[in-house]
Amino acid sequence: MEVNILAFIATALFILVPTSFLLIIYVKTVSQNN
């Protein structure tokens, strides 16, 4: 089974970018509430 590196990177970015974006918004919201 051959793994396509570009497909793997694209999938990783597609998952990590929105997750990190939501995480940053969450942290900012929590810090503002305090």
Curated annotation (Swiss-Prot):
GO terms for biological process: photosynthesis, light reaction. It is found in: Plastid, Chloroplast thylakoid membrane. It comes from the Eukaryota. It is a single-pass membrane protein. Its main location: plastid. Keywords: Chloroplast, Membrane, Photosynthesis, Photosystem II, Plastid, Reaction center, Thylakoid, Transmembrane, Transmembrane helix. Pfam families: PsbM (PF05151). InterPro entries: PSII_PsbM (IPR007826), PSII_PsbM_sf (IPR037269). One of its GO terms (cellular component) is chloroplast thylakoid membrane. SUPFAM superfamilies: Photosystem II reaction center protein M, PsbM. The chain crosses the membrane at residues 5-25. NCBIfam families: PS_II_psbM (TIGR03038). PSII is composed of 1 copy each of membrane proteins PsbA, PsbB, PsbC, PsbD, PsbE, PsbF, PsbH, PsbI, PsbJ, PsbK, PsbL, PsbM, PsbT, PsbX, PsbY, PsbZ, Psb30/Ycf12, at least 3 peripheral proteins of the oxygen-evolving complex and a large number of cofactors. It forms dimeric complexes. One of the components of the core complex of photosystem II (PSII). PSII is a light-driven water:plastoquinone oxidoreductase that uses light energy to abstract electrons from H(2)O, generating O(2) and a proton gradient subsequently used for ATP formation. It consists of a core antenna complex that captures photons, and an electron transfer chain that converts photonic excitation into a charge separation. This subunit is found at the monomer-monomer interface. Belongs to the PsbM family. This is Photosystem II reaction center protein M. It comes from Triticum aestivum (Wheat). The gene is psbM.
